[in-house]
Amino acid sequence: GLGSVLGKILKMGVNLLGGAPKQ
């Protein structure tokens, strides 16, 4: 459902923020 999609996007965002080193 929609919640699943939002959760997936949120997870992707967290991965990008947590996995991308700030230089």
Swiss-Prot record:
One of its GO terms (biological process) is defense response. Keywords: Amphibian defense peptide, Antimicrobial, Secreted. The keyword Lipid metabolism does not apply. One of its GO terms (cellular component) is extracellular region. Expressed by the skin glands. The keyword Secreted applies. It is found in: Secreted. Antimicrobial peptide. Belongs to the gastrin/cholecystokinin family. This is Caerulein precursor fragment BM2. The lineage of its organism: Eukaryota, Metazoa, Chordata, Craniata, Vertebrata.
